[in-house]
From Swiss-Prot:
Keyword Lyase in record: no
Gene: GPX2
Subcellular location per the Swiss-Prot or TrEMBL entry: Cytoplasm, Cytosol
Any Pfam family matching the protein: GSHPx
EC assignment: 1.11.1.9, 1.11.1.12
Domain of life: Eukaryota
Organism: Sapajus apella
Root EC class: oxidoreductase
Name of the protein: Glutathione peroxidase 2
UniProt KW keywords: Cytoplasm, Oxidoreductase, Peroxidase, Selenocysteine
Function summary: Catalyzes the reduction of hydroperoxides in a glutathione-dependent manner thus regulating cellular redox homeostasis. Can reduce small soluble hydroperoxides such as H2O2, cumene hydroperoxide and tert-butyl hydroperoxide, as well as several fatty acid-derived hydroperoxides. Cannot reduce phosphatidycholine hydroperoxide.
PROSITE patterns according to UniProt: GLUTATHIONE_PEROXID_1 (PS00460), GLUTATHIONE_PEROXID_2 (PS00763), GLUTATHIONE_PEROXID_3 (PS51355)
List of catalytic residues: U40
An annotated GO BP: response to oxidative stress
């Protein structure tokens, strides 16, 4: 089992360009974390909506995308290829993320990223689908398997401005529909 941090602000990640992303710098802002993949059926929808949310709350929301290849091998690019895949393939059309993408990682199993170990400990299942599990066992390519595992690409975790994990959303929950919860956390009129 992975080490679980005591606080969200103790965590960090490495961006696609190799810079350390220290979560301590996010104090006072809401944070949306989503495991992403550039070759998934909902890539265009979810990446576009992540950009939209980041643009709507440019100073009060931090959006972090964590590329992961554990679900149907739908992020098979190397770190240095991911941005070009997004720009030219899917979503394509010159797409550029307005949020931070970190280096490819695992979100489940023995080698899960510490961010996901922490978030799954605090939010063990999506609030909109508490029974969500991987539906086809042939896609489970990690060990050990846990009830709190991320079930597929584009699960989302929303963290409040005080660093408290607030809510987890399933892959079927549209990213843009998180906006009312972001406003609630930021105390913005809905």
């Amino acid at each position: 089992m992975a080490f679980i941090a005591k606080s969200f602000y103790d965590l960090s990640a490495i961006s696609l360009d190799g810079e350390k992303v220290d979560f301590n710098t996010f104090r006072g802002r809401a944070v949306l974390i989503e495991n992403v993949a550039s070759l998934u059926g909902t890539t265009t929808r979810d990446f576009t909506q992540l950009n939209e949310l980041q643009c709507r709350f440019p100073r009060r929301l931090v959006v972090l995308g964590f590329p992961c290849n554990q679900f149907g091998h739908q992020e098979n690019c190397q770190n240095e290829e991911i941005l070009n895949s997004l720009k030219y393939v899917r979503p394509g059309g010159g797409y550029q993320p307005t949020f931070t993408l970190v280096q490819k990682c695992e979100v489940n199993g023995q080698n899960e990223h510490p961010v996901f170990a922490y978030l799954k400990d605090k939010l063990p299942y999506p609030h909109d689908d508490p029974f969500s599990l991987m539906t086809d066992p042939k896609f489970i390519i990690w060990s050990p398997v846990c009830r709190s595992d991320v079930a597929w690409n584009f699960e989302k975790f929303l963290i409040g401005p005080e660093g408290e994990p607030f809510r987890r959303y399933s892959r079927t929950f549209p990213t843009i529909n998180i906006e009312p919860d972001i406003k609630r956390l930021l105390k913005v009129a809905i």
